[in-house]
Every structure is written in structure tokens, then in C-alpha cells.
UniProtKB/Swiss-Prot annotation:
Keyword entries, A-Z: Coiled coil, Cytoplasm, Cytoskeleton, Repeat
Biased composition (Basic and acidic residues): 32-66
Stretches the record annotates as Disordered: 32-81, 140-160
Coiled-coil parts of chain: 1-68
Domain of life assignment: Eukaryota
Organism placement in taxonomy: Eukaryota, Fungi, Dikarya, Ascomycota, Saccharomycotina
Name by which UniProt lists this protein: Tropomyosin-like protein
Amino acid sequence: FDRYNQILDEHNMNLREAEQILRYLKVKSVKDEETKKIKQEEAEMKKKIEGEASRKKLELEQRRTEQQPSGDANDMFGSTDDLMNLDLDNFRTDFLDFGETSERPQNDDMMKDIFEMKTADNSEGSAMDSLTDLNLDFLDQPAQAGPEPAAPAQEDDAGLMPTDQMENLFSQFDELVNSGDY
């Protein structure tokens, strides 16, 4: 009977050891499945992120290729959307001739020659000759010590734009600033 109990005890011990091993393997398999699942999710997220990055890179390249034909304005100003939409129809007459009287400066023709580069023999010397022929008499005149005398009011208004054009420009400027599209 003692021997029988001893064999049963050994058998019980073996069963308990086997039971512990099975529990360990069960827990290990659950953990392995969880790690596999986490790794798969990480791999999917990585693929998704890489896919989005490559898609964004392609879109950026497409934008660059689309913007290259209009590169002249973009090179100078960055983006054509940022440029102000101004009415420049009368720019020459309104702004470049601002304050101009009937007299033209005597060196105006020489300046035109310089900018047009009228060189018959394609040499750079003739353009430099025009530069040395400029009227630089103002350099020989001494500076006035006192403040300049005030000009009559009639002369100040002679070169200004008409009041309605000024008001129009100011109203366009106010609209632009208040709209927030600047």
C-alpha cells in the first residue's frame, strides 16, 4: 500500500510539472501572438507612413514640375499668389513723370544713349565715353548752408495727380488692407 501511494505521489508530481509546463507554454504562446500582432501593426504603420511620405514626395515633385513653366515670376517673387494685383495702366504717366515740368534735364539724351548702348563697332568704350560726358556740374557747386527756401504752393501742386485719382488709389489700398488678401 505504501508503495502504491509512493507511485501515485510521483505520478501526481509529474502531472503537476506537466501542468506547469503547459501553463507556461500557453502564456508564452499568448505573448508570442501579441508580439506578432504588435510587430504586424508596426510594419503596417511603417508601410502606411512610407506610402504617405512617398505620395507627398510625388505630389511635391508634381507641384515643382507644374510651377516650372511659370518660373520667371516665381524665381523673383516666390509665388504669383503673393503678388499684388495692381492697376498699372497709367504707371508711366502717373508715377514716372511725377513732378515733371516742361523742361527736360540736359543729360537725358545721354542717359538714353547709355541704356540703349548705341555702339556701332560693338565696343564697350563708346558707352564709357557717354558716362564721362555726363553733366556733373552739380558736384562743383558748394552746398547751401541754410535750409532750402520754401517753394510756393502752386509749384507743389503742379506735379501731383488729380485728387480723384489719389482718392481712387487710397480707396484701393484701404480695400486691399481691410480684405486681408495682402
